UniProtKB/Swiss-Prot annotation:
Sorted UniProt keywords: mRNA processing, mRNA splicing, Nucleus, Repeat, Spliceosome
First and last residues of every HAT repeat: 52-84, 86-118, 120-152, 154-185, 187-218, 220-258, 260-294, 304-336, 338-372, 382-418, 420-451, 453-485, 487-521, 523-554, 574-612, 617-650
Function: Involved in pre-mRNA splicing and cell cycle progression. Required for the spliceosome assembly and initiation of the DNA replication.
Protein name, per record: Pre-mRNA-splicing factor CLF1
Localization, UniProt: Nucleus
Entry's Gene Ontology BP terms: spliceosomal complex assembly
Subunit relationships: Associated with the spliceosome.
Chief localization: nucleus
Protein species of origin: Pyricularia oryzae (strain 70-15 / ATCC MYA-4617 / FGSC 8958)
Keyword match Repeat: yes
Length: 691
């Protein structure tokens, strides 16, 4: 059963030794084919037999035509047979009868005309062609036949008359081209120009105008060629930009370049690039680039590149006017070109695209357009008055009640300083702080006054800044650094003390560290210890304890009279003892609070300290206290389990073992007492039974 399924399998798939080709198969089939029967040749002995034969054939044709009159082939065979019999009248009658049924068949008209021409009935053929083009005026083949007949007869006015009749129907481009070529053959160039005029009105495609320009280039003058191109651009512009194509400008510019009128060619290229959409001017720009490389200089080539990029950016901002990144690139392009008027125009168009909402995220990129515009007016255009106007307009535009931009205020103030008007700069920043206070505005204003060495103004500004935002740690630190730089340590200490006393700070560790570093650098070690103790009361963190221990180590000892201050002094035993006491306090505190992770951090730092400053016994002592890591599981609120890392300390483990031993001894003692009591009770029961 399985062997019978499917096609038979070929066991030997190798090529046969004798190959049979398709050509061989066809040749054998042809050789074996029997010869077809040939119709015997018919001979007529006299006219009577001929007439009999003709009558019989006519009856057959008539029968065919009556049965299938809509079959044009029967009529054509009938008419052709009558022509072979030299019966022209009968043939003409057959054609006319066929036309009554098939008046729209072009083939019938052509065969009828050719039959009359073969019979040398020229006037009959002309009449037929006239009837044909009148009945089927949209069939170009009949018109071409009519024109050919008249031209073969040498009737050029008649040909021209036929063409005129034809052109009234506004045929396709090939018919107009044939009419023009007729006039060219006979040297009637003015007539050809007149035909071109009508031709371009009916078919105003650019290719037809280019044909006209080539005609004028061959038979006319350069002025006529220019007139054709200019007229083409003017006429096509009336229909809209979609009818104007880049190849028209390319042909015009190439012609001018051929005449070595490079300025005119360059102007044509630029005109085309400015008036055509970028999507339709890719080839034009490529041709312009090639032209500049061939005939222009470096400036010309750069102008081509700038023109291409300019068109690209114009298309992008036309599609999305709120794409500020494109405006940035567009403005930089114009800045690189050095055209002040064009650059200013681009910036003005860009800043006119105000964000539609008052959300600051929509304004972040937009505001840089104003800043770049003002900087360009100041540095490149050398017009400070216009730059000031740009800043003022920008500040009026920003909704300061909702948000503000400190960078704009700062740029305006720096601009006024560069112009030598310090009062205007202070007025600008004062107005900014009064209208919309902001940390960055205070910071910039203070930095400006510091550079001017106006420290009294800096103190006033710091006071206002603290009143505005007392939680800003950077303000406290910077103010203290200013006072320390002015050698007013008491004021700096008071400022830092006020800073750490604030109930809310964004980064309190910064103020504490600055205060501690300040006291340490000034050599006030007791005050530094006091600060550490105060900090530990607020934040019991391992990092604070480690920093505290490092501080105790780094306290320099009082050097003798002959000691070199620059030479590094060894750490004293007293400093090591102080540091160890700090570590012991930290370790014991975290141990009491059962804070294992913090306890491990302290032990690691303590071990590093002992490896650096301690002995082998000290290191061993700390290593014995180091815990071992173990993985445990705990149940969560959603009845799932998670794995976590726990630390087991040797001291805690020993305490646990001792506690277990004590509990075991207590259990054993209780069990012994219970057994003794049971034995005593049993003895009492036995004595009573004996009595």
């Amino acid at each position: 059963m399985e062997a019978s399924r499917g096609p038979p399998r070929v066991k030997n798939k190798a090529a046969a030794p004798v190959q049979i080709s398709a050509e061989q198969l066809l040749r054998e089939a042809t050789d074996r084919q029997e010869e077809a029967l040939q119709k015997p040749t018919q001979r007529f002995e006299d006219l009577e037999e001929l007439h009999e034969y003709q009558g019989r054939k006519r009856k057959e044709f008539e029968s065919y035509c009556q049965r299938s009159g809509f079959n044009l082939k029967n009529w054509l065979q009938y008419a052709q047979w009558e022509l072979e019999q030299k019966e022209y009248a009968r043939s003409r009658s057959v054609f006319e009868r066929a036309l009554n049924l098939h008046a729209n068949k072009v083939t019938l008209w052509i065969r009828y005309v050719e039959a009359e021409l073969k019979s040398r009935n020229i006037n009959f053929a002309r009449n037929l062609l006239d009837r044909a083009v009148t009945h089927l005026p949209r069939v170009d083949k009949l018109w071409y036949k009519y024109v050919w007949v008249e031209e073969m007869l040498g009737n050029i006015p008649g040909v021209r008359q036929v063409f005129e009749r034809w052109m009234e129907w506004q045929p396709d481009e090939a018919a107009w081209s044939a009419f023009i070529k007729l006039e060219q053959r006979y040297g009637e160039y003015d007539r050809a120009r007149e035909i071109f005029t009508r031709f371009t009105m009916v078919h105003p495609e650019p290719r037809n105008w280019i044909k006209w320009s080539k005609f004028e280039e061959e038979y006319g003058t350069s002025d006529r060629v220019r007139e054709v191109f200019e007229r083409a651009i003017e006429e096509l512009s009336k229909y809209g930009d979609e009818f104007v194509e880049e190849r028209l400008f390319i042909a015009y510019a190439r012609y001018e370049a051929k005449l070595h009128d490079l300025d005119r060619a360059r102007a044509i290229y630029k005109f085309g690039l400015e008036n055509l959409p970028r999507s339709k001017a890719m080839l034009l720009h490529k041709e312009y680039t090639t032209f500049e490389k061939q005939y222009g200089d470096r400036e010309g080539v750069e102008d081509v590149v700038l023109s291409k990029r300019r068109r690209h950016y114009e298309d992008l901002v036309r599609e999305n006017p709120k794409n500020y990144d494109v405006w940035f690139d567009y403005a930089r392009l114009e800045e690189a070109s050095g055209d002040i008027d064009r650059t200013r125009e681009v910036y003005e168009k860009a800043i006119a695209q105000v964000p539609p909402t008052q959300a600051k995220r929509h304004w972040r990129r937009y505001i840089y357009l104003w800043i770049f515009f003002a900087l360009w007016e100041e540095t490149e255009a050398k017009n400070p008055e216009r730059a000031r106007q740009v800043y003022d307009t920008c500040l009026k535009l920003i909704p300061h009640r909702t948000f503000t931009f400190a960078k704009v205020w700062m740029h305006k103030a720096h601009f006024e300083i560069r112009q030598g008007d310090l009062a205007a700069a202070r007025k600008t920043l004062g107005r900014a702080i009064g209208m919309c206070p902001k940390d960055r505005l205070f910071k910039g204003y203070i930095e400006m006054e510091q550079k001017l060495y106006e420290f009294g103004r800096c103190r006033i500004l710091y006071e206002k800044h603290i009143a505005y935002n007392p939680a800003n740690c950077s303000t406290w630190v910077k103010w203290a650094e200013l006072e320390r730089g002015l050698d007013d340590l008491d004021r700096a200490r008071a400022i830092l003390d006020m800073g750490i006393a604030q109930p809310v700070l964004d980064m309190p560790e910064v103020v504490w560290k600055s205060y501690i570093d300040f006291e340490e650098e000034e050599g006030e070690y007791d005050k530094t210890r006091s600060l550490y103790e105060r900090l530990l009361d607020k934040a019991d963190h391992p990092k604070v304890w480690i920093s505290y221990a490092q501080f105790e180590i780094n306290i320099p000892e009082e050097a003798g009279e002959g000691a070199d201050e620059e030479q590094e002094q060894p750490v004293s035993d007293e400093a090591k003892a102080r540091a160890r006491r700090v570590f012991e306090r930290a370790h014991q505190g975290f141990k009491d609070k059962e804070m294992k992770a913090e306890r491990v951090s302290i032990l690691n730092a303590w071990l590093v300290f002992e490896k650096t400053h301690g002995s082998a016994e000290d290191i061993e002592k700390i290593e014995k206290q180091m815990p071992r890591r173990t993985k445990k599981k705990r149940k969560l609120d959603d009845d799932t389990w998670e794995e976590y890392v726990d630390y087991i300390f040797p001291a805690d483990e020993q305490v646990g073992k001792n506690l277990m031993n004590m509990m075991a001894k207590a259990r054993a003692r209780k069990q012994a007492e219970a057994e003794a009591a049971a034995k005593a009770a049993a003895a009492d029961d036995g004595g009573e039974s004996g009595e």
